[in-house]
UniProtKB/Swiss-Prot annotation:
Phosphoserine: residues bearing it: 23, 191, 195
PANTHER family: MRG-BINDING PROTEIN, MRG_MORF4L-BINDING PROTEIN
Stated name of the protein: MRG/MORF4L-binding protein
Location of the region described as Disordered in the Swiss-Prot/TrEMBL record: 1-27, 128-204
Upper classification of the organism: Eukaryota, Metazoa, Chordata, Craniata, Vertebrata
Stretches with biased composition (Basic and acidic residues): 128-140, 153-175
Gene name as annotated: Mrgbp
Annotated compartments: Nucleus
Compositionally biased intervals (Low complexity): 189-198
Keyword Phosphoprotein applies: yes
């Protein structure tokens, strides 16, 4: 096939010192009839329109670059095709290769009802939280009242213990007194010489 003609055949020395020589990919392509024929051969079986136009353009670019013997960017091919065809109109008129029916979306009533119920529950929870935030002292009063009742119960139990211990001490003191009286009687009986038991002992 024909070779692509490259514009700007001047020598590199003719350019200014601040300008660099363009890379082969950035060089402009002179679209001669032979080069256009190479492009049409590369486009066989590939239409650069529709939703898959960029994938088709990759195949066209690879085949076209192989035919002319140099790499050509896709933008150069797009620009040249747009000079020959109305690419936007072709793209819009292209039929989709897959079914794509359009219909209005309607949210099911079940989901709407669930959302409404969820909102009601959330509102009730928020009201309860607001009540708890507004009345923080009520819980503290309950705690203080419960602690006060516990303190009273502990005081009563301690008083009962003291009573029991005092009663036990009184009983023990009474028992000790009784025992001391009995022992005193026994001792006096044994030490008295006028007792009959002592007289009997003397007689014997």
């Amino acid at each position: 096939m024909g070779e692509a003609e490259v514009g700007g055949t001047g020598a590199p020395g003719d350019k200014g010192p601040g300008e660099a020589a363009p890379s082969p990919a950035e060089e402009t392509v002179v679209w001669s009839p032979e080069v256009e024929v190479c492009l049409f051969h590369a486009m066989l079986g590939h239409k650069p329109v529709g939703v898959n136009r960029h994938f088709h353009m990759i195949c066209i670019r690879d085949k076209f670059s192989q035919n002319i013997g140099r790499q050509v960017p896709s933008k150069v091919i797009w620009d040249h095709l747009s000079t020959m065809y109305d690419m936007q109109a072709l793209h819009e008129s292209e039929i989709l290769p897959f079914p794509n029916p359009e219909r209005n979306f309607v949210l099911p009533d079940e989901i709407i009802q669930e959302v409404r119920e969820g909102k009601v529950v959330i509102e009730e929870e928020m009201k309860e939280e607001m009540k708890e935030d507004v009345d923080p002292h009520s819980g503290a009063d309950d705690v203080f009242s419960s602690s006060g009742s516990l303190g009273k119960a502990l005081e009563k139990s301690s008083k009962d213990k003291e009573k029991n211990s005092s009663d036990l001490g009184c009983k023990e003191g009474a028992d000790k007194r009784k025992r001391s009286r009995v022992t005193d009687k026994v001792l006096t009986a044994n030490s008295n010489p006028s007792s009959p038991s002592a007289a009997k002992r003397r007689r014997t």
